[in-house]
Swiss-Prot record:
One of the GO BP terms on file: translation
GO cellular component, one term: ribosome
Organism ancestry: Archaea, Methanobacteriati, Thermoplasmatota, Thermoplasmata, Thermoplasmatales
Disordered as annotated region, ranges: 195-215
Entry superkingdom: Archaea
Official protein name in the record: Small ribosomal subunit protein eS1
GO MF, any single term: structural constituent of ribosome
Family classification: Belongs to the eukaryotic ribosomal protein eS1 family.
Entry keyword set: Ribonucleoprotein, Ribosomal protein
């Protein structure tokens, strides 16, 4: 009997919840990215939504990449979000490195033209062994490039750039006189601050928040 009562109570609680539509930010099209149940609008705030980048851009070559959004508020049953980062799946990175011989990791905080800060993590994989001098030159060139690029763009434009198609060709161009690299990926980005508002560097829910993964 106790089990039946608990089950009934759970069903009643579920019925009391409302379906909310979660949208990407305006700078990524204000697209409906998922739906989720919530007790009220306040219960939705700070939840994190994970979305395949291919769903946002239509580029299915990016099926290994996920964007992360944090819900900032709701208007009725529509939830608004901000972009807080993205990442490439670890399995893809491991396969990438296994097929080649050298890996270089670059991590840099980039400040955009409107004062936002985002941590950018780049992975470089070469087909052959690199000298320490070459590695240093590649790191320096890519760090200089991504910092300069970010400083020229607003946060919204830089987000579109990070998950778009142009970054790869631009990074290859930035290093072509050092070594003919064939694989350079922005493997992860993490929002540090946006318009003076501090954001957690880890892609985890804030206290009381809940992660939502899109199926």
């Amino acid at each position: 009997m106790a089990g039946e009562k608990a089950q009934k109570k759970g069903k009643e609680k579920w019925k009391e919840k409302t379906w909310y539509t979660v949208e990407s930010p305006p700078y990524l099209g204000s697209k409906e990215v998922t739906v989720a149940l919530g007790e009220d609008p306040e219960s939705m705030v700070n939840r994190i939504v994970e979305v395949p980048i291919s769903d946002l851009t239509g580029n299915f070559k990016k099926s290994n990449e996920k964007a992360l959004f944090r819900i900032t508020g709701c208007e009725g049953t529509k939830c608004k979000t901000i972009f807080i980062g993205h990442y490439i799946g670890d399995d893809y990175i491991r396969r990438l490195v296994r097929r080649r011989k050298e890996r270089i990791d670059i991590i840099e905080d980039v400040k955009t033209s409107d004062g936002s800060i985002i941590t950018v993590k780049i992975v470089v994989v070469s087909d052959g062994k690199l000298t320490n001098t070459k590695k240093s030159e590649i790191r320096k060139a890519l760090t200089s490039f991504i910092v300069s690029k970010g400083s020229q763009l607003s946060y919204a434009d830089f987000v579109r750039y990070l998950i778009g198609d142009d970054s790869y060709n631009d990074m290859v161009e930035a290093t072509k006189n050092i070594y003919p690299l064939r694989k350079i990926e922005i493997r992860k980005s993490e929002l540090v601050s946006l318009s003076g508002m501090q954001e957690p560097q880890k892609n985890e829910p804030a206290p009381g928040g809940e992660a939502i993964a899109q199926n």
